[in-house]
A protein has these predicted regions:
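Bacterial N-terminal signal peptides that target proteins for export
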Residues: 1-11
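Sec/Tat signal peptide C-region and signal peptidase I cleavage site
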Residues: 5, 15-24
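Short, low-complexity polar/charged micro-motifs in intrinsically disordered terminal tails
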Residues: 14-15, 237
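Sequence context of c-type cytochrome heme-c attachment sites
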Residues: 20-106, 111, 117-149, 181-241
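Substrate-binding/catalytic groove segments of enzymes
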Residues: 119-121, 164-174
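A conserved mid-domain beta-alpha-beta active-site/ligand-binding segment of alpha/beta enzyme cores
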Residues: 156-159
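Secondary-shell segments that build the walls of catalytic and ion/ligand-binding clefts
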Residues: 176-179
Length: 241
């Protein structure tokens, strides 16, 4: 018979293992977010992020592809070295796969910035409901601990700055061929681009369901000039910026 302490250690180790597995990235797709954040979703549909997969199709963005020494007639939607920066969660649990492509993941959507939603979405919804019914606020840490990303600069850098000679220390193969040396328009500065609503989406007033840290560094600035959500949109039941 195993020593009681050894047995206890084994049980605790297994618990930690399965708890970690339960919180591993699990993507659900943008439709889950847009069911509450209708205004943000509507605005996002007009951005290049929403059309990211389209640019991988044959005959699209010919001039840009030629400049980057790519074949403009090739179908890059099947190329694993390209797809990762055009979809949600490629190569991660629950994320987009080439073999079984899911439309709600086939773009750079909500979860590419805000993190895979399965583990935190329920708590996020409950926070909105608690605020709506009782005026009770929820600490952001509750959803941050379950995977919601409030500081997503690295997620952006992983695609926009992932090239040879990049100033970003995390750059590694497969590199993007779309670099500032190919065209200056590929120069990427997070603090500038995150404020470009044409690149991201319009910001809308949030009802204050969440409080405390971690808080996105431009949260207050964005909220100060945010638009009022369209009538019928549920303000307090989706992602916080």
């Amino acid at each position: 018979m195993k020593h009681p302490i050894t047995y206890l250690f084994a049980v605790l180790s297994m618990f930690a293992l399965f708890s970690g597995a339960a919180l591993a990235d699990t993507y659900e797709g943008r439709t889950k977010c847009s069911s509450c954040h209708k205004s943000q979703a509507k605005s996002w549909k007009d951005t290049a992020h929403a059309k990211a997969m389209e640019s991988l199709k044959p005959g699209t963005r010919k001039e840009a592809k030629v400049k980057a020494k790519l074949d403009p007639e090739k179908d890059y939607t099947q190329d694993k070295d390209c797809v990762g920066c055009h979809v949600d969660g490629f190569g991660k649990k629950g994320g987009y796969t080439i073999e079984a492509a899911k439309k709600p993941l086939a773009a750079v959507g909500c979860e590419s910035c805000h993190g895979p939603g399965k583990n935190y979405r329920g708590d996020h919804r409950k926070a909105g409901q608690a605020f709506e019914s009782k005026g009770t606020t929820t600490q952001r840490k509750v959803v941050a601990d379950k995977g919601q990303d409030f500081h997503f600069e690295e997620s952006c850098n992983a695609c926009h700055l992932n090239y040879e000679g990049s100033p970003w220390k995390g750059a590694k193969p497969p590199y993007t061929p779309f670099t500032p040396s190919v065209d200056e328009k590929y120069t990427f500065t997070f603090d500038k681009m995150v404020k470009d609503v044409k690149a991201m989406h319009e910001h809308y007033k949030l009802d204050g369901s969440f409080t405390g840290e971690p808080k996105f560094k431009y949260h207050d600035e964005f909220q100060a000039s945010a638009k009022v959500p369209e009538k019928g949109a549920k303000k307090g039941k989706g992602k916080d910026e």
